[in-house]
Amino acid sequence: MRKSFFFLVLGISICWIQPVSAQLEPTNLSNAKSSTSSVYKRGERSWDGIGKYYLGREIAQVMSHQGAMWLDRPEREEEERSSVLWNNLNLSSTDVVADIGAGTGYHTFPLAKRVPQGKVLAVDIQQEMLDMMAERMKENNISNVELIRGSIWSPRLPENSVDLVLFVDVYHELSHPNEMMQNIVKSLTDDGVVVLVEYKMEDPAVPIKTLHKMTKAQCEKEMDAVGLKLKEYKNNLPWQHFLVFEKAN
C-alpha cells in the first residue's frame, strides 16, 4: 500500500500549481495589501512552493481540481483514519461547520450527517470542486450543505455564525493566510473554534512533500498571530496533527 501511494503522489505533483488562486484576486487590493504586506517576505522559490514566506514558512503551491481523484482515494481512511478525525470534532447535531478547501466533499458529506439540524458550509476557491460537490448533493439528496466560492483573502462566511472551522491539509496552501485567518476569526461564534489538521513535519516517515507538512509549533505560531490560542491537541492520527484553537480574548 505504501509503495503505491508514493507513485500516486508523484503522478499528481504537476497539479499543485499556483495559478488556481491567482485568477481569484479581488479588485480592491490596495487597502488589504498595505495593511498586511509587512507580514510576508519574498525569497528563494522551492520547486513546489511559491517563493512567498509567512512567519518563516514558505507557502506551498495549490493542488488543483485535476488532483481530485487523490482526495477520494480508497486507501485514505486506512492512511489517515478520517473517521477518527470526525469523532475528534465532537460535533453537536445543530452545529454550523465550515469546511475550508472542501474539495470533492470528502469530509463535507460525512460531517453533514453528524449535524442533521445544523449545516456544513463547504468553501472552495475552485468552481470545478464546487460543481463536483453540487452533483453529489443532487445524487444523494443532501440539503444541509451550502456551497460557497471563497477567495484567496476570505472564505466569505457570515460574521459570528460558525461553531467550527475545519482545515484538513489545506492551511499550508493559503496564499494569504493572515488575511484569511482574520476573516475566519470574524466568522466564529463567541465559543467557536478552528481545527487545523496538517501532516506532521516532525515525522520524516510521513510520505508527503515537505512544504505540504507543518510542525505543531509553526501551527501555533501562525494562529497566535491572528489572536487564536491552542485549546486542545490530539495525537491519535497516524500522519497528521489535530489542533483545536479558540479566541484568545
Residue ranges and their predicted role:
Residues 7-16:
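Bacterial N-terminal signal peptides
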Residues 28-92, 96:
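Class I SAM-dependent transferase core
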Residues 98-154:
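Class I SAM-dependent methyltransferase SAM/SAH-binding core
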Residues 155-164:
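A short acidic, Gly/Pro-enriched loop at the edge of an enzyme's catalytic core
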Residues 163-177:
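A short SAM/SAH-binding and catalytic strip from SAM-dependent methyltransferases
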Residues 178-193:
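A short glycine-rich, Lys/Arg-flanked "PGG" loop and its adjoining helix->strand segment in the class I
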Residues 195-220:
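Conserved class I S-adenosyl-L-methionine
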Residues 231-249:
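Core SAM-dependent methyltransferase catalytic element
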